Amino acid sequence: MLPEEDLKIIRKELGREPTLVEQGCFLNLWSEHCSYRSSAPLLKTFTSTGENVLIGPGDDAAIIKFEDGYVLAIGMESHNHPSYVDPYNGAATGIGGIVRDIISMGARPIALMDPLYFGPLDTPKNLFLFEQIIKGIAGYGNCIGVPVVNGETFFDRRYSGNPLVNVVAVGLCKEENVTTSRSQKAENKLILAGSSTGKDGLGGASFASRDLSESAEAEDRPSVQVGDPYTEKLVMEMTLEAIEKGYVKSCKDLGAAGLGGASSELAAKGGLGARIIADAVPQREPNMNAYEILLAESQERMLFEVAPEDVDAVLALVQKYDLNGAVVGYLTKEPTYTVEFGGEIVADIPIAFLTGGAPTCEKPSEAPTLREEGKKPETPEDLKVAFLKVLSSYNIASKEWIYRQYDHEVQLRTVVKPGEDSGVLRITGTKGIALTCGCQPRATLLDPYNGGKTAIIENSMNLAVKGAEPLAIVNCLNFGNPERPETYWQFENAVLGLGDEARKLSIPVVGGNVSLYNESDEFKTAIPPTPSIGMIGKVDLEIPLPSGFFAKDGDSIILVGETTPEMGGSEYYACMDSGNAGMVPAVPENAPELIKAIIEAVKSGKLSSAHDLSLGGIGAGLARMCRSMGAKVDLSELAGETQADELLFSEAPARALLAISEPEAVREILKDVPHAVIGKVGGETLEIKGKNFELSVSLKEIAEAYGSLTRFMMG
């Protein structure tokens, strides 16, 4: 039901009581999910322009200039609530929706990433959600032939009952084929093409704009869409062919609010109105009413604006691909949104009011009571036990069980496969892109502003170790109930942190999604603030890319960046049951210089290996690089007054490990940033020495700890 405050505004504008169909349109298009009514003022603080940005926020996806006449389409979406209610279909249709966003811009999807967040797997419900969500992503992505090349998987008890499924998609096309969702000309026809329209997904947009109740699995299942990847593949090919032949004047995929959302937004963006003939829509079920036809979120559907003379050609294309298609309306000069059904007018709304009239506001924001730092844990007597415990944490352990279910090599562009800091794809002969995603939710929980900044730095470093120059950022801003002042304060400060650090690095934030009300009645939890981002960069493939693992016996190991003792939000503190203690490490002022230096070091072509340091710090980073060969490392010179566990597990941002046969070859590049040669690659063990500790772990022990998640899931 529409809130009474909204109804008052609507009655005043219309001068009458809205019809049932009109109420449905407003309920969905004025929902938080569609209108960003709580977040719009904050989103405007992002810098979204740049020399390579052709289309920024506001369309189905952003368009970034690449090379040789090619452009990249990039978008990011969430499908959180549906993935709790029906995890397989919720995750699958999350993939389908973001892929259609890319297609609607005229681009062929070439890559996916999936930042995912779950509750602990020792709870049967969380384990079920985890398994089904991964299956849903794999089942849909593999069938449509788009590789999943990178991702993040993070576990925390606060995601119990409210997993987060975020998806990034990237597409490629020639600049002349870019299509937008801005309508072009009155009297042009609106063609609905793809799957037929059923009753699935009704109210999906409004469902995504409230907390999950204990009865959500039963009550909200009709709000979850059901996907068909084989139809999606046909829709993809049909749409791209129609665009390449010049038939499509504007295009929008049908997602939130279904035909009602797509047709009204497309028309309004071009300053036009629309008249929809609901009876003309190809229907999957008998006796559907106008409300259902207009607002169902059935998947695999696209809306095209087509000139009258091209209608027959487009419908012939639709038939060629064995899809459903029909003219369902037309654009009008009058700026109204009119829906006809059964010969009667069931909706007649000023279109700008429908698509842009939702009242936006900044919610009350209140900082929480100042948190006590708490007591840091004593340094463990047996450091090796702590080391292996951290390494076997599912947040750090190998995610091989996940990405082995994905086809990450389809389309034959993949240069760097999943399991490294970033995925790399070949675009043209010598140019490629690097892709990375994620954030650090525990750091953002303790310090939202610094957590937002850290997300930008962490992803920038993931690109840097592959020599990639950042091009653009997209985001999924996942938070709890914004009506709680403390939650809105978290949201506000995380957004400001993201924006400030992105500006400092001159990376535009070109699009994304806001997902609020992520709270679970069943588990009595609210998610930690999760400003998940996707980042894309340009890579020169003429230069040999360093491996994320030690690759050459005898290489010198260089640590770049400063290690600080702040441990707040760290995986080590979580493993030691001190999760709320400590201060979050600050992003260093010289982070841009550190990132630039690492990029230049990689571009020198001299590095054998390079790896960003994040969760688990130096200890976990070294262990991860010891996949097939060991290392001897001496951290004594770095220690100062730092405790052994802080030295090993600090997650101070903007640090990396480099391996090179001749360190002098990059000394000039690194001369203006903190760095030190800390050891050599070789042997069958990882040996780490500090001022007052020595640690020796065999490659077998490392492999066993690092394989904990795979072993559990295969168990």
From Swiss-Prot:
Alphabetic keyword roster: ATP-binding, Cytoplasm, Ligase, Magnesium, Metal-binding, Nucleotide-binding, Purine biosynthesis
Binding site for Mg(2+) 2: 101, 253
InterPro entries the UniProt entry points to: PRibForGlyAmidine_synth_PurL, PurL_linker, PurM-like_C_dom, PurM-like_C_sf, PurM-like_N, PurM-like_N_sf
A single Gene Ontology CC term: cytoplasm
Active-site residues, Swiss-Prot/TrEMBL: 33, 79
Family in the record: Belongs to the FGAMS family.
Subunit structure comment from the entry: Monomer. Part of the FGAM synthase complex composed of 1 PurL, 1 PurQ and 2 PurS subunits.
Protein name per Swiss-Prot or TrEMBL: Phosphoribosylformylglycinamidine synthase subunit PurL
Organism: Methanosarcina acetivorans (strain ATCC 35395 / DSM 2834 / JCM 12185 / C2A)
